[in-house]
Amino acid sequence: MANSPQAKKRARQNERRFAINKARRSRIRTHLRTVEEAIASGDQAAATAALKAAQPEMMRGVTKGVMHKNTAARKMSRLSSRVKALGA
């Protein structure tokens, strides 16, 4: 257990950051799930709209340190290619 005042403060800050990051990760996953569902339904218009909504959310996660930038880029690339394939 944390003994020094500094360690106690860091523990409090870690709890707070964990809650914020957890909410942010959850919001990103929700957006990704809506894109996946739109792709599964075969509706390109809905999938494109969901992808446009998910992209800034993922980039915000990268900026805030919740997700690595290469992971976000890979997910966006794969999703956009799948959405594009719906129209072909």
UniProtKB/Swiss-Prot annotation:
Swiss-Prot/TrEMBL GO biological process terms: translation
Alphabetized UniProt keyword annotations: Ribonucleoprotein, Ribosomal protein, RNA-binding, rRNA-binding
One cellular component term from this protein's GO annotations in UniProt: small ribosomal subunit
InterPro entries, A to Z: Ribosomal_bS20, Ribosomal_bS20_sf
Annotated segments matching region Disordered: 1-25, 61-88
One Pfam family, short name: Ribosomal_S20p
GO MF, any single term: small ribosomal subunit rRNA binding
Function, in words: Binds directly to 16S ribosomal RNA.
Family assignment from sequence similarity: Belongs to the bacterial ribosomal protein bS20 family.
Protein name per Swiss-Prot or TrEMBL: Small ribosomal subunit protein bS20
Organism listed in the record: Jannaschia sp. (strain CCS1)
Gene (name only): rpsT
